[in-house]
Amino acid sequence: SNAFSKIIFLDLSDFNSCSIDRIVKASNLTKGAFYHHFKSKKELGLKVIELKIQERIHQGMIAPLKRPGNALDLLKDTFFHRIKLFSLYDKKHGCPFNNLINEIGGLELAYRLALKKIIDEWKQAIIRIIERGKKENNIKKGISSNAVAIYLISAFEGVRGIRKLYDNDTILAEYLLGLSSYLDHIQAN
């Protein structure tokens, strides 16, 4: 419903300290309408993770890796494209996913499991494309696909926070240089 969408797609930065009253006010809904859709703030948090965060990661970082083509090029294109798409708002506020991990990931088991599920799906997509690249002889066979996946995810998520801290796009340019160098390093000769 429209009310459901209003709540889910609010900017819920600072989710942990955000009260239901504040959510209700920001969405222009009544408390009754809120509780019609969500039994609790925890349930809202899980829906935001599922419908907003998971969808964003899937569309931007997982689905592109399933396309046909050179595996290494797909990795490079996916990470480069996503960084270049960030709006000024995205750059200033950092990654909603990473922000949630830092804010609520350690507080509640249900949140931690939902956030880990997204990382696991993303990691598996990267592992699959790396394994495909090894079979197609465009990625070195001796590298650990799991280690590369964790490294790529960590570097991508980390640079978003560093960019937010420094408020400087040079950080993203340096990241892209490092990413390009790293991916060239794992390319099969």
Predicted segments, located by residue:
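Short hydrophobic clusters on alpha-helical segments that form packing/core surfaces
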Residues: N2-L10, R82, F156
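Helix-turn-helix
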Residues: F9-K47
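Hydrophobic alpha-helical connector segments
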Residues: K47, I62-H93, S145-L152
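Short, basic, alpha-helical segments at the C-terminal edge of helix-turn-helix-like DNA-binding modules
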Residues: E50-I57
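Amphipathic alpha-helical segments used for helix-helix packing
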Residues: L74, L88-A110
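C-terminal peripheral helix-coil segments that are non-catalytic and often amphipathic
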Residues: D77-L85, D120-E136, I150, A155, ...
